[in-house]
Amino acid sequence: MRIVKLTAESKKGLLEDLLQRSPNHYGQYESAVAEIIEMVKKGGDEALFSYTEKFDHCKMDAAHIRVTREEIDEAYQKVDADFVEVMKKSAANIRAFHEKQLRNSWFDPKPDGTILGMKILPIAIAGVYVPGGKAAYPSSVLMNVLPAKVAGVERIIMTTPPGADGKVNPGTLVAAHIAGVDEIYKVGGAQAIAAMAFGTQSIPKVDKITGPGNIFVALAKKACFGYVSIDSIAGPSEILVIADETANPRYVAADLLSQAEHDELASAILITTSKTLADQVSIEVDRFVANLSRREIIEKSLNNYGYILLVDSLDEAADTANEIASEHLEILTKDPFAMMTKIRNAGAIFLGEYSSEPLGDYFAGPNHVLPTNGTARFFSPLNVDDFLKKTSIISYSRPALEKIHQDIECFAENEGLTAHANSIRVRFEKED
């Protein structure tokens, strides 16, 4: 890995480099995605099946688009029993963590008869997109579905692309069953996002779409936002490690590679105050890469977006981390909790040498759907709140309104909205 002494100039170049990975820079695909969305919006199932045959090489029809109970049972036979148990344990952890996020409706009555409050209810239908093929990750099913279940969403549907044989990845189906998905449809890509956003004869229109996907899926979610709520427009995976001289270089190297193997656009960055550690980590990375199954992807990823940044102090490391606002941030320092207090921007923070990033990917319980490409500055991980909607409640008695009605009329008149003022004034007209 390249080792760079961090300066104002090198930091500027690094940040510009990382931002080029954003889906907002994939403009050349937007017209193709827009065409797919429009065709599905107008053509419904017919367009959906046509695109499924074109992109997934699978002939699909209304009779076979929905996964049956028999197909789920068959999937259980194909998935290792030990893995099924591991998924159940993971699901229990995810559910327990997200249950702590639940919020109830509240009301605040006053002695004068005023009642203010917030009515909190789950959305009616959630749609989860799950990639297929080599990118089929059962963990994504659990992480996207379980917060919706905890929130109380009554109907959760899932779309995932079929193989040429019309089958869906068995691990994906088992995870969906464990998580409690109500309906699973064999359709993928931008066409699946369009189907959930606008509805077709076979697939219902949903209130919110979540889940990862390729460039086309990301752009489709972006284009459909406003017609439907979405979780985020996720970019490539990223990890940033802050480490000092106390860190184990093998641990640091292994953790950097855990994200670099995702794809060629993934970023893996170490920020350290120790030149010795920097050199050791670089050596360990080379040793690990030689024996990893996704070596080619890792090498391209590190060549594109792999950095070891040398800084003068941990305060400088924290400042840089806050500017990058990484999806995953590991802190491997003498006092990681003290270091954590200096971090404002990160999707998830992993503290200490036994809190490796994959712990969060699979098992700990916090959601692994995290903001990327610097959006941790203003976005949060997927959570129960994403599947809840809130409605303000306002109730005033006549005496309560009478005390303030002139204030409201004054406000309305100063904004030039006389009908607003009249709506209040008319309630206190003297009867003849």
Q: For the regions a protein language model found, what residue spans apply to each?
A:
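Short acidic-hydrophobic, aromatic-tinged amphipathic segments that line or gate anion-handling sites
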Residues: 3-9, 183-188, 308-313
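Short internal beta-strands
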Residues: 154-163, 268-274, 281, 352
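Conserved NAD(P)+-binding/catalytic subdomain of aldehyde/semialdehyde dehydrogenases
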Residues: 180-258, 262-267
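N-terminal Rossmann-like NAD(P)+-binding subdomain of aldehyde/semialdehyde dehydrogenases
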Residues: 1-124
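A glycine- and small/hydrophobic-rich beta-loop-beta segment
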Residues: 262, 270-346
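Conserved small-residue-rich beta-alpha loop and adjacent elements
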Residues: 108-174
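C-terminal core of ALDH-fold dehydrogenases
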Residues: 322-432
